Amino acid sequence: MDHIELISSPLDITTLYTLLGDPGCGASSVFVGTTRDSFEGKKVLSLEYEAYEPMAIKEMKTICTDLRAKWPDLKHIVIYHRLGSVPVGEASVVIATSAPHRLSALESVSLAVDQLKTRVPIWKKELYEGDDPAQWKENKESLRPKHSQVTSNRFNFATCKIEKQNENISDKLVQIRVHDDELSKRVECFVRRKRMEINMLNVRDFTQNQSLPHVLNNEEAEVSCARTQGAVIKQEQSNCHLKVRRVNNKSGPQQMHLRPNYAQELNKLMGSSESSCDPSGQVQNDLANNRLRTIESYMGLSANNQSLLSRLKQVENRILLLESTSPEYNHFTNNLKQPDSEEPSPKRLKRKIYCAEELNNLLKSFKDETGS
């Protein structure tokens, strides 16, 4: 059994020792911590203990659990700690265990003392005789980080040197010419206005009753609240509760189906350039060079006595430029088919939509067929 307590009265060691009694135990180990009369040449009058009691009790119970996990044969565990003023010679802490064998009792008490000083949030202040001021004692065995370690990791702003700013700054580089107060005021106004816009949109999108007069008139009622009256309202022709708008581009190569005569009109405009690109008069011995000259003349490029690879690179750059800047380049890249040679588009199959009752009937018929 575990006996744990924080008390303000003196500790009675004899009474606590009776808590260890058990017929099956052959050994008991007791540790008693008392107040000594001196510390580093100073005469100590008393010690004062303070604790964060809920957390201290929790940690003491955890210590008991750890002891029983390591020594399962422990019968009783006693951890009593005194709070308040403890004069010289009186006990401040009692830790005791009982077990069938002495080794478990001795080792468990030693570990419990170390864990108590390391984990339990109990603080001690020493009161000295004379003019020496009282001093809170730092527990060097505590697992918690020391104040010096925390402060040492902080950033030292003194190491950052601020260079003198150049006063000869051009006015063109300064975008805001107001004081800090005016700038803060503008930022606050901007945030307030955006907050009002968001609140109004929330009322429009999430209000529970769209027919309310204050909603239709963009006015805020005294008893309305978007958080409490909000509801998910599915918009028409949309899979979500927010409004979705579809934009159709009425011009460009991707919208040619909206202009049936677009290809014919573009062919008429390009007819003159196509007829002028006749490579019959530019026959050369090198077939690759001949074909490249045809492409260059068609695209309006000049060879300028460059190498074959350089001319190919020039043609590629020209194609990339046309693709990025001219929508009508779709006439060159896409092989448009005549209306007579267009293949019929495959018909979309309409799938029948079954209701829940029809599905149940189908499943029932399948079960009957398999069962028969």
Curated annotation (Swiss-Prot):
GO terms for biological process: chromatin remodeling; Mo-molybdopterin cofactor biosynthetic process. The keyword Ribosomal protein does not apply. Keywords: Cytoplasm, Molybdenum cofactor biosynthesis, Transferase. One of its GO terms (cellular component) is ATAC complex. GO terms for molecular function: molybdopterin synthase activity. It comes from the Eukaryota. It holds the Pfam family MoaE. The keyword rRNA processing does not apply. Its main location: cytoplasm. It catalyses: 2 [molybdopterin-synthase sulfur-carrier protein]-C-terminal-Gly-aminoethanethioate + cyclic pyranopterin phosphate + H2O = molybdopterin + 2 [molybdopterin-synthase sulfur-carrier protein]-C-terminal Gly-Gly + 2 H(+). Its EC number is 2.8.1.12. SUPFAM superfamilies: Molybdopterin synthase subunit MoaE. Pathway: Cofactor biosynthesis; molybdopterin biosynthesis. Substrate binds at H101, R102, K117, K124, K125, E126. It is found in: Cytoplasm. This protein is produced by a bicistronic gene which also produces the small subunit (Mocs2A). Belongs to the MoaE family. MOCS2B subfamily. Catalytic subunit of the molybdopterin synthase complex, a complex that catalyzes the conversion of precursor Z into molybdopterin. Acts by mediating the incorporation of 2 sulfur atoms from thiocarboxylated Mocs2A into precursor Z to generate a dithiolene group. Heterotetramer; composed of 2 small (Mocs2A) and 2 large (Mocs2B) subunits. This is Molybdopterin synthase catalytic subunit. It comes from Drosophila willistoni. The gene is Mocs2B.
